[in-house]
Amino acid sequence: MQKQVVVMDEAAIKRALTRVSYEIIERNKGTKDLALVGIKTRGIYLAERLHTRILEIEGMDVPVGDIDITLYRDDLSYKDDDTREPAVHGTNIPFDINGKKVVLVDDVLYTGRTVRAAMDALMDVGRPAQIHLAVLADRGHRELPIRADYVGKNIPTSANERVEVRLTDVDHAEDAVIINKNE
């Protein structure tokens, strides 16, 4: 079994999301023209949690959507290797993003490739006024010039490690762990 070190427990995740919610509100001077878009899979659940906290803090309902970046990735995955048909899950943005301040939400920022794909997918939906990035964990090792605007926790890692965020909505656990790939 691979060695796992817990770097964020359930309480730390909750605190980080609350802080990020306040930062989003402060930087955008409220919630006017603000929208949250979660990157599948865990980014969707984190966007929903940020939405809930912003609603509690400001009393304003911010639109929330989700984006599937499957067709925009440079490491496309397939549901069937024989047909080479991509595994597409669908995008759900039930509001106009034109002129909005969109906050893309993801669980872990690593190379920046997922975020680049998400921005490409978002631009195919519309033209936001601004795109910001919120992540629960930033582990470094960027390959592209991408930086998160809102970070729950910076988690430095080596090339042999990966950060895995587990949410009860998907994983039946609530934490962030560093996993050593060599153990």
UniProtKB/Swiss-Prot annotation:
It holds the Pfam family Pribosyltran. A motif (PRPP-binding) lies at residues 102-114. One of its GO terms (biological process) is DNA-templated transcription termination. It catalyses: UMP + diphosphate = 5-phospho-alpha-D-ribose 1-diphosphate + uracil. Keywords: Glycosyltransferase, RNA-binding, Transcription, Transcription regulation, Transcription termination, Transferase. InterPro entries: PRibTrfase_dom (IPR000836), PRTase-like (IPR029057), PyrR (IPR023050), PyrR_bifunctional (IPR050137). It comes from the Bacteria. GO terms for molecular function: RNA binding; uracil phosphoribosyltransferase activity. Its EC number is 2.4.2.9. CDD domains: PRTases_typeI. NCBIfam families: PRK05205.1-1, PRK05205.1-4, PRK05205.1-5. Belongs to the purine/pyrimidine phosphoribosyltransferase family. PyrR subfamily. Regulates transcriptional attenuation of the pyrimidine nucleotide (pyr) operon by binding in a uridine-dependent manner to specific sites on pyr mRNA. This disrupts an antiterminator hairpin in the RNA and favors formation of a downstream transcription terminator, leading to a reduced expression of downstream genes. Homodimer and homohexamer; in equilibrium. This is Bifunctional protein PyrR. It comes from Listeria welshimeri serovar 6b (strain ATCC 35897 / DSM 20650 / CCUG 15529 / CIP 8149 / NCTC 11857 / SLCC 5334 / V8). The lineage of its organism: Bacteria, Bacillati, Bacillota, Bacilli, Bacillales.
